[in-house]
Amino acid sequence: NLSKESVTVKEVAELCKKNNPNVKLEATKDEVPNLGYTLSNKKLLKTGFKFLYNLDFSIKEMIQNWISNENIENLEFIRAGEKEFIDERGKISNYELPESINLVGYIESKKNTIRANHFHPVQEQKVLSVKGQFISIYKDLLNTNSNKITHVANEGDLIITKPNVAHAMVFTKDSIILNLVRGEREHKNYGITHTMKHVLVNEDEKKLLINSYKFECRCCGNNKLKRIISLGYQPLANNLLNNKNQNCEMYPLEMNYCSNCHNCQLSVIVDPKKMFSNYMYVSSTTKTSREHFIGAAKKYIKEFKLKPKKSYIIDVGSNDGIALKPFKDLNFKKILGIEPAKNLAKLANKNKIKTFNGFLEKESLKKIKKNANIILASNVFAHSDKLKEMAQCIFGLLHKNGVIIIEIQYLLNTLKDLTFDNIYHEHYNYWSLTSLINFFNQFDATIFKAEKINTHGGSLRIFIKKGKKNKIEKSVKILLKEEEDFGIKNFKTYQDFAKKIYKIRKNVKKNISNLEKKNGKIIGYGSPAKATTALNFFNVSDEISCIIEDNKLKHGKFVPGVKIPIVSKNKLKNKKNTILVLAWNFFEEIKINNKNISNKFINIKDLEQ
């Protein structure tokens, strides 16, 4: 739709530069194939047809459209074969290509090797995986805020990568791939080679990916997992830095969905010893958490007729003993915590709450007294890669008439309320009641009761007994129907969630920038794991001068990735501070308790619109 008869490449380039000063122009010495391309048609003009836009306006409009849209979708995507025909001879799969090809490259790759580490300025890359498996890593080079994203290509997958997307392949099995090419290997007319080197994955990252990637569902074993969302490469959320220049390992933070059992899990497994050997999250820090477990203890004592001298209570992942302390205060004698973090187990034992320091696994089972009447596990089933082993151990410790009470951050709340910042590497799994029932069905056990609770921005509490003959309360059926109606079994529900989260990132970046321009430097409040996830995903660093934290163990540390210092609120002298509350689930408590340091508190959730 151009009003000019002919135009040269140089003219188009200069108009692009005019409308977007960030464009870099590079002249080449290549032979120009012709002096200009005819873009209009005289015969067409004679019919009375008129061009609406001139070239300058058209380019400006395109650039504005590109700027307003975050190019997240379809930078690289995987397509399975369609219209399959299967008989006794085998299988035929068909792949419809968006464009014709004129060259096929046959490539063999050994396990534990890297290929690609490049991008194509002009062409799409299309690779068909014939045999084996590889992890594909890609990044949009046209968007400076883009994340590095990974996904898995299995046999029979067609992987399509867009131009100007850097990509690499880490082979986890001996593999054969076909490279399907349109065009020549070089574009001499434009002075640009077909393939430009761009090292996206080095040897260290290759080893990290190979050692940590999770290819199958840990609940049912399905290896065809679907990507929900990528929050980019992120540091371990609670591994705070001792100084600003300290390096930290970065791992993909990506959630996958299993269409077989509806489990959601991360794409990688980080060695738990790296996260839990010296754990910074102390549950008793907030009054809200303490009151929650006091109320829970009183509820369980009444509901299950627990006796102070007889009833035996175990808490798995007991932290500093927060869930057992109310029982101790009510004179319960037989209580035991199981906690892998040395510092927290030591703290609990110091406070006279008997705590076993270690992971709950087969090796440690023989060291722990059995026949518990109640076994508590608060946010523990999110923290284990060895779910089946842990579940077997819990059932092994339980009295035949005992009850397991599990609290988990509720996936339905995460999806509804867009609380993506509850996603971090400690949380291997993200549970719905639907997926929990599918999981515990494997152990001849019954979830007989379920209830929503308010912790962590929305959680679920379930009650489990051994055997299949237990009466199931209405609460289970009601919540299952709510999940079904919401679309917990429909992958589109998860795709819609991801789209909304990418939009939130754009809004928060804009609103924090406006807030800083209006009020100067911003001070954060609270450095929970969710703050690490959010700040790194938003790429917010210099905009926040420091973060106040009530947990003394964190003072003098830095948030990994964004490297924002964590300080005591005693450091603040000016009541005119703008406080951005990152621990948004404790917003009201923080606001009420800190009127002396500021009269302006903003919940980070309010910046998402």
Predicted regions and their residues:
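Short, glycine-/aromatic-enriched active-site segment of Class I SAM-dependent methyltransferases
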Residues: 406-429, 433-435, 440
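N-terminal juxtadomain amphipathic helix
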Residues: 210-288, 451
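A short, N-terminal "cap"/entry segment at the start of jelly-roll beta-barrel domains
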Residues: 71-103, 116
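A short glycine-rich, Lys/Arg-flanked "PGG" loop and its adjoining helix->strand segment in the class I
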Residues: 388-403
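Double-stranded beta-helix
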Residues: 78, 170-208
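Short acidic-glycine-tyrosine-enriched beta hairpin
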Residues: 141-163
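Conserved beta-strand signature within the Rossmann-like core of class I S-adenosyl-L-methionine
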Residues: 401-409, 602-603
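C-terminal substrate-binding subdomain of Rossmann-fold SDR/epimerase-dehydratase oxidoreductases
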Residues: 1-77
